[in-house]
Structures are given as structure tokens and as C-alpha cells.
């Protein structure tokens, strides 16, 4: 079974542009990471505050490549995966769908799993209203599963040419991969 664990960093909150896409591909035989930075025409100040990527920095990191330059590779990887997994996956799928639509293409995938929603009844973090449970932030999920930042950094260095901190798509994609792996080992997830 081919599974992709992924995350995006974006130019803002409404589907604008993806400035970084990272994913871990697990196909039963091997695990590999892919990280892509993209040149973008703008980054909202609020987004830059979160991930630290300016238009100039992205131009350098991407080597001038735009999302459309890697569209075929991304389309193949995601459309051939049996499952794609992300934390608040609906957000990331929305941006991927938008990027594909800019090129008059359709973003295709078979099935998705949102780790944020799937782990809500497992983590059981109380809401401030004391009714039901709140969605765990990725950091809260890692803490619940006893996955530490150095675990994520070590795995990033094994899968990618570099490593970033929280709100770098490499970090978040690897964190989701490790969370699902650990949850399966603990029998919390099938």
C-alpha cells in the first residue's frame, strides 16, 4: 500500500499559492521524502511570520521553479497513492486543488485521512467549553504520542537534504508520518 504523508506552506490562508510542499512516501518496501520550494509572486505578512519564507528567500530556495514546473511529478505521486495523510488535510487539499486548477488540471487522489480529526477521540483533549474534545494541534499530538522534536529532526535528516522546525513542511510531514507509525505500534490506529 502506497501512503503519502504531506504538508504545505502557503502564501496565506485563502487558496493562493503553495510555497513549499513536502511529503513522505511509504510504499511497503521503502520510505522516501520529497521537498519542493516554489517561487511565488507574493507572501502575506501573516504567513511569512509563521513560516519565515519571503518572496526573495523562496526565489533562492526554489531555484526559480514554480509549482507548475513540478506539476506532473506531484500529480503522479498523489494520484498513484492509495492514501494521502495530513494534519488538517482539508486545508492542504484545498491549496493543491487550487494550484492544479491554475494549470487547468484536476488534483486527483484516491482517499485521504486527516490526522487532526482521526486523533481527536484518541487524544481526548478537553475543549474550553468542557463539551466534547478539541482537535489536537500537531505539537499536542506529538506530545501525546511521546514523539520529541529531536525524533522529528533526525527523521527529517534521513529523508530530506535538510531539516526545518515546526511550520516547515518537511518537519510537519515527517511529524505526521511518525505519529501514524507510533500510533500503529501502540495499537491506537489500524
Task: Show where each model-derived region lies.
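P-loop/Walker A phosphate-binding loop and immediately adjacent motor/lid segment at beta-alpha junctions
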Residues: 103-111
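Short alpha-helix plus adjacent loop in nuclease-associated cores
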Residues: 113-133
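Acidic, Mg2+-coordinating catalytic module of metal-dependent nucleases/exonucleases
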Residues: 80-90, 95, 131-190
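Conserved non-catalytic scaffold segment of RNase H-like nuclease domains
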Residues: 1-104, 140-147
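A structure-centric signal for secondary-structure junctions around beta-strands
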Residues: 18-20, 109, 170
Amino acid at each position: 500500500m502506497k501512503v503519502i504523508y504531506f504538508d504545505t506552506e502557503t502564501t496565506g490562508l485563502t487558496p493562493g499559492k503553495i510555497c513549499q510542499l513536502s511529503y513522505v512516501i511509504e510504499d511497503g518496501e521503502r520510505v522516501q521524502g520529497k521537498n519542493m520550494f516554489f517561487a511565488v509572486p507574493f507572501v502575506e505578512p501573516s504567513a511569512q511570520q509563521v513560516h519565515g519564507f519571503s518572496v526573495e528567500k523562496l526565489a533562492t530556495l526554489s531555484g526559480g521553479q514554480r509549482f507548475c514546473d513540478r506539476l506532473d511529478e506531484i500529480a503522479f505521486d498523489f494520484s498513484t497513492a492509495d492514501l494521502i495523510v495530513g494534519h488538517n488535510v482539508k486545508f492542504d487539499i484545498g491549496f493543491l486543488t487550487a494550484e492544479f486548477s491554475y494549470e487547468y488540471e484536476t488534483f486527483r487522489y484516491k482517499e485521504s485521512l486527516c490526522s487532526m480529526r482521526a486523533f481527536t477521540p484518541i487524544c481526548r483533549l478537553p475543549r474550553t467549553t468542557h463539551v466534547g474534545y478539541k482537535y489536537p494541534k500537531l505539537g499536542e499530538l506529538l506530545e501525546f504520542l511521546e514523539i520529541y522534536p529531536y525524533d522529528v529532526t533526525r527523521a527529517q535528516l534521513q529523508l530530506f537534504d535538510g531539516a526545518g522546525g515546526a511550520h516547515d513542511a518537511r518537519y510537519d510531514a515527517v511529524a505526521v508520518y511518525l505519529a501514524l507509525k507510533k500510533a500503529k505500534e501502540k495499537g491506537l490506529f489500524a
